Amino acid sequence: MGNKPTIAISHLGCEKNRIDSEHMLGLLAKAGYPVDNDEELADYVIVNTCSFIQAAREESVRTLVELAEANKKIIISGCMAQHFQDELLTELPEAVAIVGTGDYQKIVEIVERVETGERVKEVSADPTFIADENLPRYRTTSEGVAYLRVAEGCDYRCAFCIIPQLRGDQRSRSIESIVAEARQLASQGVQELILISQITTNYGLDLYGEPKLAELLRALGEVDIPWIRVHYAYPTGLTPKVIEAIRETPNVLPYLDLPLQHSHPDILRGMNRPWQGRVNDGIIERIKQAIPNAVLRTTFIVGFPGETEEHFSHLLEFVKRHEFDHVGVFTFSAEEGTAAFDLPDPVPQAIMDERRERLMLTQQPISERKNQAYIGQTVDVLIEQENPETGELIGRSARFSPEVDGLVYVTGEAILGAIVQVRITAADTYDLYGEIV
């Protein structure tokens, strides 16, 4: 057999997609394929696409078109491949393979088939696969950080979301499998482990007959990783048992990412959120009472069909009242195939944009005040980057999650991937500044 082709991966989308990319890289490297970051040098480029909202699809399409114009052989994977498999094969002659969200583990066999001249479509109609600790993985995050998927898919059917159609129903890994992978990552020097799934608080429901996040967190408390962070916690799943496990497990950070999406009962019912119209106030107060140092991040959607100025004002007051640490705001994106696609009373884009701006302006002074409260304190910071020109270090404190929250800019010397103590000397709306002590 001759030399194997060089392969690059262009990763788009969420951290769940990132893990799929990392497994494909790991499988290809294990099979002896040269893997390169430089798409220009690669014989094949795998584009792991996102199809969550229109803007994400547009980014995926731009990437595909650029590669096609450069005459690259393209393997399209991810949510867009699952969503538009036939259209992509028709529109992009450069696409030599389409790989579904439940089929990335077959990537070596797919490349082998493509090499014989076959045009491959490997897309399971109903994805059921979930990778475990035995599937090779090549991490693409900074040295100190790793994402760990505890479950794949979703059993909820929120009106605005197409993800269950693209990634299938929920399937959880066993506690033993997750802990085994966490130990592997600890042995690689990982300092921060971020637990992800579509709904992390529902972890284990399909496997054990009841959610087992509390038990999982306590088991991960035995693993030698200083920071364990939970993403995508639904408020309904933050039971006293889960809150207690967060409070009592020293390496589980008191950081909760709560995708609330709205506050008004009418809009929550329209969205078909799992807690329907039950307002979130009580749950948030319970978290703050049980974990006084809890860091709360949330996301909201403005402009859902039927959202009136009264509904939006309710959301503004909700944000003022609860003073979240971090808030992300999206404008509604009508997705074909979802229940919300053709709902009456659409909100004009200009009004959506204006509401997003107003909500962000409401949150910014809250975020800035919370950041400024850290001035003079000494906090642990995970160092992730160094500016080669200035020598300035860039990292995150425990209250900042990667990609979505702020950064800590640090003067002093430290090893990348290490957690060091930093005295905070300044703060702005999103970031902190300090010096190593």
Swiss-Prot record:
Ranges for domain MTTase N-terminal: 5-116
Catalysed reactions, as listed in the record: L-aspartate(89)-[ribosomal protein uS12]-hydrogen + (sulfur carrier)-SH + AH2 + 2 S-adenosyl-L-methionine = 3-methylsulfanyl-L-aspartate(89)-[ribosomal protein uS12]-hydrogen + (sulfur carrier)-H + 5'-deoxyadenosine + L-methionine + A + S-adenosyl-L-homocysteine + 2 H(+)
Cofactors (names): [4Fe-4S] cluster
UniProtKB keywords: 4Fe-4S, Cytoplasm, Iron, Iron-sulfur, Metal-binding, S-adenosyl-L-methionine, Transferase
TM regions (residue ranges): none
GO annotation, cellular component aspect: cytosol
One GO BP annotation of this record: tRNA modification
Residue numbers binding [4Fe-4S] cluster 1: C14, C50, C79
InterPro entries named among the record's database cross-references: Elp3/MiaA/NifB-like_rSAM, Methylthiotransferase, Methylthiotransferase_CS, Methylthiotransferase_N, Methylthiotransferase_N_sf, NA-bd_OB-fold, Ribosomal_uS12_MeSTrfase_RimO, rSAM
Subcellular location(s) of the protein: Cytoplasm
GO molecular function: 4 iron, 4 sulfur cluster binding; aspartic acid methylthiotransferase activity; metal ion binding; protein methylthiotransferase activity
EC number: 2.8.4.4
Residues covered by the Radical SAM core domain: 140-369
NCBIfam families: 30S ribosomal protein S12 methylthiotransferase RimO (TIGR01125), MiaB/RimO family radical SAM methylthiotransferase (TIGR00089)
Family (UniProt): Belongs to the methylthiotransferase family. RimO subfamily.
Protein name per Swiss-Prot or TrEMBL: Ribosomal protein uS12 methylthiotransferase RimO
